[in-house]
């Protein structure tokens, strides 16, 4: 018998076996049916868009006036501005207030840097090769604080207490393969800390305690062609870090977020890969190390993602914005670091660059809202959970 006939023979044998296995169910259950294809739940709906500055890159939920309601701030690179939108608490926001800031503000960090009652902001100013501090006020506006030069093109910034003095510090990623530490003084000023040269084109930074020792650790995505990795820097608790450990990611990793994908109460990583339309999950071991990454498919041009249980099944899901296909993808987790496919996609305005989660509160419940920053449209767009139905009178006119 030839190889081809053996293959066909196996196929016929397998078909007969399936028929024999199915035969009892045919008489008892009325026949054998194919498993229905997976259909992702439709949990969100587009609600409204709001104008911000030109080419916005980040949106950050923050209660700027401390009234218990989430507000939003965006960095707008091409207009050199910061937009503040005061929240009404029902998923809607007032019109933006713009503040002219530094050259090409690309990303921001928030904290109580001068230890008053109102949150402050530090901007990574790519066009000015500096970071700029803004102090919050009771009316929700910001005033300029000190600026600190950095060597070249700050790309990303993160903030937490790095040296155990209960004062917020900063980590800044620079385009020339450097990481710069700034240690807070508690009065809104900073002093220069350690500087590290490592990796290839850092694209994002994030801080968390990854080994449960009470000290902040650092995660950096390196998007250059010589790296394509996520680097784990274990903190020493004094504002310095040990030599990093690299984990291979997909091509051109752009952003990293934390979550718990397998419900073991250990921090895992979500890494968005800008090329080849994928994202990677890394399951944590609890000691600052991670298992090898698992790649999953995304839509065209994923740019940023976040982690949250959106459907209440106690399994972490992810929301990803895709800048080329101009949509928001929700992928529902299986509880092991993998995800159901296909995702639920929602059309966005052109060029969604980032996404953030914010609280929407009603008298009956609290639900997650999602906000995308639309780089190609100069807007932010609100997507509300279907458990929330604000009245038609509260819905603002959508911006084009």
Language model feature labels by segment:
Residues 78-80, 127-129, 176-178, 224-227, ...:
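Short glycine/acidic-enriched loop and turn motifs that connect beta-strands
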Residues 353-399:
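Blade-level signature of beta-propeller repeat domains, shared across WD40, Kelch, NHL, RCC1
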Residues 72-75, 121-124, 170-173, 218-222, ...:
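Hydrophobic beta-strand segments that make up the repeating blades of beta-propeller
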Residues 32-54, 86-103, 135-152, 183-200, ...:
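Blade-edge motifs of beta-propeller repeat domains
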Residues 15-29:
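Bacterial N-terminal signal peptides
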Residues 68-70, 117-119, 166-168, 214-216, ...:
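Glycine-aliphatic tripeptides that mark coil-to-beta-strand junctions in extracellular
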Residues 57-66, 86, 106-115, 135, ...:
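Beta-propeller blade termini
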Residues 1-12:
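N-terminal secretory signal peptides that target proteins for export/translocation
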């Amino acid at each position: 018998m030839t190889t081809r006939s053996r293959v066909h023979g196996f196929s016929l044998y397998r078909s007969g076996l399936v028929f024999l296995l199915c035969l009892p169910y045919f008489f008892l259950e009325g026949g054998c049916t194919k498993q229905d294809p997976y259909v992702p739940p439709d949990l969100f709906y587009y609600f409204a868009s709001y104008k911000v500055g030109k080419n916005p890159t980040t949106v950050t939920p923050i209660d700027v006036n401390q009234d218990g309601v989430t507000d939003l701030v965006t960095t707008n690179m091409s207009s050199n501005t910061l937009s503040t939108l005061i929240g009404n608490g029902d998923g809607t926001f007032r019109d933006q207030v713009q503040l002219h800031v530094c050259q090409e503000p690309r990303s921001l960090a928030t904290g109580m840097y001068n230890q008053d009652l109102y949150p402050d902001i530090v901007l990574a100013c790519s066009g000015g090769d500096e970071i700029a501090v803004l102090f919050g006020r009771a009316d929700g506006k910001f005033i300029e604080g000190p600026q600190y030069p950095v060597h070249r093109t700050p790309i990303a910034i993160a903030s937490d207490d790095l040296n155990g003095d209960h004062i917020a510090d900063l980590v800044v990623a620079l385009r020339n393969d450097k990481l710069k530490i700034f240690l807070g003084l508690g009065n809104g000023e900073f002093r220069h800390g350690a500087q590290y040269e490592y990796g290839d084109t850092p694209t994002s930074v994030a801080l968390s305690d990854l080994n449960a020792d009470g000290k902040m650790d650092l995660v950096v995505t390196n998007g250059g062609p010589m790296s394509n990795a996520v680097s784990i820097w274990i903190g020493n608790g004094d504002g310095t870090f040990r030599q990093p450990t690299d984990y291979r990611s997909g091509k051109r990793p752009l952003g990293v977020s934390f979550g718990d994908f397998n419900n073991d109460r250990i921090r895992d990583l979500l890494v968005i890969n800008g090329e080849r339309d994928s994202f990677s999950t890394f399951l944590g071991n609890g000691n600052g190390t991670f298992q090898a990454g698992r790649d999953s498919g995304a839509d065209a041009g994923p740019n940023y993602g976040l982690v949250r249980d959106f459907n209440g099944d106690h399994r972490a899901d992810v929301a990803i914005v895709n800048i080329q296909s101009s949509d928001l993808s929700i992928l529902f987790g299986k509880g092991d670091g993998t995800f159901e496919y296909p995702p639920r996609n929602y059309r966005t305005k052109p060029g969604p660059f980032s996404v953030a989660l914010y609280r929407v509160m009603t008298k009956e419940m609290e639900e997650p809202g999602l906000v995308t920053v639309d780089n190609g449209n100069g807007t932010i767009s609100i997507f509300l959970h279907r458990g929330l139905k604000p009245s038609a009178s509260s819905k603002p006119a959508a911006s084009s």
